[in-house]
Amino acid sequence: MDDKYTPYGGGNTRLQIAKELFAEGDQRFAQLRVIVKEWPGDAQVITAHLVENELRADITFWEKARGVHQFRIELEREQQKPLTAGELNRELRARGLNYGVKTIQNFTFATEELAPVGPWLKSTQVNEVTRPKVSALLELGAKLGQGKAMREQLQVVMHQYGDALRLRAKSNEDLEAAERLPVELDDAALLADLQLAAVQELG
């Protein structure tokens, strides 16, 4: 496909299916009739893909968080102003994505503070445990005048966990299915190590 054209609003899925059918010998898909429209802006295209992805049962919390984060960046650039969580909620709803304000806040916190372990985050855990505890540590550091140092120490710990999980996933590629180790974030261990790092930072 020419670089100046891109599928829109679910087109990626349909295009992939058409390619597979053509590869199997179905000549009806040798050519496709398409409608060419003016580019509506990056923000609109991002939400169209998010709506498409919502139909997938396997879409992860992190994929949603990153998509909403990218949408926010593009929409703020287009509108030339920052958006509150409430405003972002309304913009997403207008485009068919019904994420609540608290969910959007969790997405934002994950992309800003939990990115090193992002691919292994679970929605419920972030909402009920991880975000409240990490927020408390960050707030404590800020109150004691060590906000930047505290955040850096917490990021070091999260990078260690993220690197270990990526290494395990890579090692699993060379193993039979029955031999593979689960690649899951141990939330309790992570939070314990984050708290220890915070204590050490504060002395």
What are the roles of these predicted feature ranges?
Residues A85, R93-R151:
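Amphipathic alpha-helical "recognition" segments
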Residues A18, V68, L194:
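Aromatic/hydrophobic pocket-lining residues that form π-stacking "cages" and hydrophobic walls in ligand
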Residues E20-E24, F71-E74, A110, L114:
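Conserved, well-folded catalytic cores of nucleic-acid-processing
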Residues N12-T13, W39, F107-F109:
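An acidic- and aromatic-residue-enriched active-site/binding cleft used to recognize and process polar
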Residues G25-R90:
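Amphipathic, charge-rich alpha-helical segments that serve as recognition/docking helices
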Residues M1-L32:
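Short, charged/polar connector segments at secondary-structure boundaries
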Residues M1-Y5, G141-G145, A149-G203:
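Accessory, typically intrinsically disordered or conformationally flexible segments
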Residues E20, R90-A94:
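Residues at alpha-helix termini
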